[in-house]
Structures are given as C-alpha cells and as structure tokens.
C-alpha cells in the first residue's frame, strides 16, 4: 500500500488492523461501497454515506487521540482525512493532513524499512494536502506542498518517484493557471526528466515549449517547438502534438513578420500532418486545414490584378472576338489553378475552413466574371474603323452599337456559366454554415453574395449544378434569405413558436 500511495483504491483501503481502528474502518468501508477503483471518492454521495464517512472520521480521530503513539496513528489520520474529503469538507481534511506532516515529519525510523514507511506516509500527506488546497482554490498552499515533494531530498528515492513527478506536474499546472509561465516551464521540464511514463513525458516536453508561446516569447517559441519536433518526429503517439507544435511556429513567425519563413512553416504544418497519421476531422486537421487554406489564399489577391479581358488593337472583328475568347480561356485556366488550390482543404473535414474554401472559390470565379463584364471593347477593330470613316455620324453610331451587341453576346455566353460556378460554391458554404450553426465573415459573405443574384438566378444555377452532380441539393426559394442588420425576416403565415412548457412539466 505504501509503495502505491497515489492509487485511489490503495489510499482508501490501507489496512488498519488494530482493534482501536476496526470499527472506524467498518464504517468507512460501508460508506465507500460502490466507489470505482480509479476514484478516491464518488462524485455524489447519499446522506447515509455522508453520515458514515463522518462517523468513520470521528472514530479514527478519537482512536488516534487515545493512542497518539500508536504505529498506525498517522495512517488512521490520513484515512480520516480521506473520509472528510469524500464529504467535501476540505478544510477539515487539510487540517488532518497538516497534523500528519507535523507529527511524522520530525520522526526518524529505527530501520530502513520503518524510514521508508514514514516517508511514504509523509509523501501521501503532502500530496493530499496539496490536492485538497488546490480544490479549495488555495493555490499558493497547494504549490507550497507540491514543491516540498518535488524539492525535498527525502522524497528523491525511487519509492517516491511517482508521487514526486505527479507533484511536479500538478505544480506546473497551477503555475500555468496563475500565468507564471516561466516557473511552469521549469517544473514541466523537471517532470519530463523524472517521469517514466512515455506519454506523460511527451506531454511535459510539449508544455515546456507551450509556455514560451504563452508568454509571447516568439523566438523562444520557435526554438522550443522546433526542439519538440526534432525530439518526437518519429513518435507515432505524438501526432497531434507534433502538428500543434508546427502550427505554433507558424504563429510565432507571423508575429515576427517573417513572411518567407512563415510560408515554409505553413508547408511544414501540412507535411507534419501528412506524416502524423492523424485523421480528417481531428484537432490536428484543424491546423493543417488552416495552413493549407492560408497557402491557397495567397493566390487570390494577385488574381484580382492579373485577370483582365482587353484584346487590344485587332485587324478584324472576327480576330477581336477570337482574342476575347482566347483571353477568357487563359484567365479561366489561371482562375482554375487558384480554385484547385483550395480543393485539398475540403479533405481535412474541418467545417470552418471548408466553408472558407468554398467562399474563396466563389470569389475567384466572380473575379473572372467581373473581368468578363468589364471587358475593354476599345480600340475598335481596324476593318470596322475603316468602314466608319466613310460613313455618316448616324451610321458610325449604328455600326458601333452593332459591334458592341455582337461582342456582348459572346461575353454573355461566357459569363453565365462562370457566375453559376460561383453561386454553387456560395450555396455549399451557406448550407454547411447552417448545418454547423457557424457564423463568421465567410458565411456572411456567402449569404450576401447569393442575395445579390436573386432567387431566379440561384435556382437556375443550382439546377445546372444538379444536372452535373445528382447529390447537390435542390434549391428552396428563400433558402438563403437573411435579414439586414437591425431588421427581422417576416414569418410565414401559420407558423408560430412552440408554447413554453409549464412549470410542472
């Protein structure tokens, strides 16, 4: 029992065999019946259990007071304190743990075995005192007790390794909660060096790096996170932490405004995720999808500058129209490259970035549509200008209008399918947002852009998309309607909010 004093069942069931404690132990066991093996106390107890715990604690304390020099007196006090913990009387439990520390601390064992037993009891008292203080929001007292376990050479032996490393980690967590990140990092580092469990050591090493991030030490974040990546790169169980560490480096690079290094760090997040074995939809996939989206999004601003429809001077009307078609085809390929860059984001199955990718794809198509709408139709083709020189002003005006109508027909043929591509992407984004109850800048953009097209055009575009993809849901009139700020949507006749349930229901 003393060798495993951090195990809940062992703590609660240490053998108190002497007659003085037998009745108290019986009461404790009755109260403790049904408690899971991995818990010190049940989450909720009945009134009967509460009375039994209190009677057990009182009986043990009375027995100790009658025989304070009894060899099992310290363990009886600890079990009495546990009984009080189970009734949420943390202050009373803390006083008993402190009493054990005061009485056992100065004692020296006559044999190595007795010394080890006293050390185990003392470690148990310090740990439970710290735990109770933490639960009682007395963080300074908790840290003080944990630091004794972590720093006192009396607890440095192998027999107390587990309780000592638990104390290091718990102290680090309290320091982190108090935003004392430097101290937290120190205790996490010591825990990583002392702990035997592989997973606990891995997490402790990561928390050391995370403390640099928390205190906004960006250079330290890069150094510590890269160190974690190097240490655990081949560890199959570190997948999520590896991706998180890679993302922290991205954030640090962004804060330092290191644009070139940020781009490389983003790509490293994607690569780390691919090697990690993490599944789509996981927490690690969130960072990978954001990284992939950010990389893809770099192509959108240049698109606004490069996509233009301006055929320039052409010898004939036919060559002018052909030049327009060629430019639109070239621009469409450029847009398609940007659109395809967002496609991998969808595979991570993270709603926020899936929606963002759909919206940005829609934006890319609308850039092309806008370029087609605003196509430059001057200068007029040479053959047309020659004809117009010999004509009257009225004829020249008529010829120019006919030319513009001819070109506009060509442009109209090109623009409608492009707009429908955009509408389909916005519709996917809006539907995903509604299904996930997500409201952000991308979802609002999707709805706003859909409303600009109107019901008839949306229905037409979605019908075209359905013809190509049977899984694409049909459009419901008003599906993407949204109230303007400060206004409400009208409620359809016959609809009403459900009645409120009565107080007795």
For every predicted segment, state its role:
Residues 1-505:
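Acidic, polar-rich low-complexity tracts and alpha-helical solenoid repeat scaffolds
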């Amino acid at each position: 029992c003393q060798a495993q004093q951090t195990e809940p069942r062992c703590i609660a069931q240490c053998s108190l065999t002497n007659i003085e404690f037998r009745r108290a132990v019986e009461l404790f066991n009755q109260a403790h019946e049904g408690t899971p093996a991995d818990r010190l106390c049940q989450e909720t107890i009945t009134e009967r259990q509460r009375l039994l715990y209190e009677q057990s604690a009182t009986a043990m304390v009375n027995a100790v007071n009658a025989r304070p020099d009894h060899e099992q007196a310290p363990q009886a006090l600890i079990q009495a304190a546990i009984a009080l913990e189970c009734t949420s009387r943390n202050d009373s439990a803390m006083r008993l743990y402190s009493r054990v520390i005061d009485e056992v601390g100065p004692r020296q064992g006559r044999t190595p075995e007795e010394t080890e037993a006293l050390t185990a009891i003392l470690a148990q008292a310090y740990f439970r005192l710290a735990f109770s203080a933490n639960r009682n929001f007395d963080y300074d007292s908790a840290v003080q007790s944990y630091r004794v376990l972590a720093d006192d050479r009396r607890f440095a032996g192998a027999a107390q390794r587990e309780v000592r490393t638990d104390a290091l980690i718990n102290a680090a967590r309290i320091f982190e909660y108090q935003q004392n990140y430097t101290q937290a990092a120190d205790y996490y580092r010591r825990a990583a060096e002392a702990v035997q469990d592989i997973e606990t050591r891995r997490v402790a090493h990561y928390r050391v790096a995370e403390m640099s991030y928390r205190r906004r030490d960006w250079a330290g974040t890069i150094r510590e996170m890269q160190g974690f990546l190097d240490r655990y790169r081949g560890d199959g169980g570190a997948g999520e932490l590896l991706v998180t560490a890679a993302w922290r480096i991205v954030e640090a690079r962004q804060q330092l405004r290191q644009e070139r290094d940020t781009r490389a760090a983003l790509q490293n997040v994607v690569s780390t995720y691919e090697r990690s074995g993490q599944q789509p939809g996981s927490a690690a996939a969130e960072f990978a999808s954001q990284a992939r989206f950010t990389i893809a999004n770099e192509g959108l601003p240049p698109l606004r500058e490069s996509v233009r429809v301006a055929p320039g001077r052409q010898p004939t009307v036919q060559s002018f129209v052909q030049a327009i078609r060629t430019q639109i085809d070239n621009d469409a390929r450029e847009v398609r490259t940007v659109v395809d860059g967002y496609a991998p984001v969808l595979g991570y199955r993270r709603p926020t970035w899936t929606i963002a990718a759909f919206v940005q794809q829609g934006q890319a198509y609308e850039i092309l549509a806008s370029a087609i709408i605003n196509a430059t139709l001057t200068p007029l083709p040479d053959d047309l200008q020659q004809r117009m020189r010999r004509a009257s002003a009225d004829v020249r005006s008529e010829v120019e209008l006919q030319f513009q109508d001819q070109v506009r027909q060509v442009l109209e043929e090109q623009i409608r399918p492009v707009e429908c591509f955009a509408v389909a992407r916005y519709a996917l984004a809006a539907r995903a947002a509604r299904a996930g109850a997500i409201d952000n800048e991308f979802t609002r953009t999707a709805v706003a852009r859909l409303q600009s097209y109107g019901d008839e055009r949306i229905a037409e575009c979605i019908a075209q998309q359905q013809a190509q993809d049977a899984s694409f849901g049909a459009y419901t009139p008003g599906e993407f309607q949204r109230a303007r700020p400060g206004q409400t949507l009208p409620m359809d006749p016959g609809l009403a909010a459900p009645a409120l349930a009565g107080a007795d229901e």
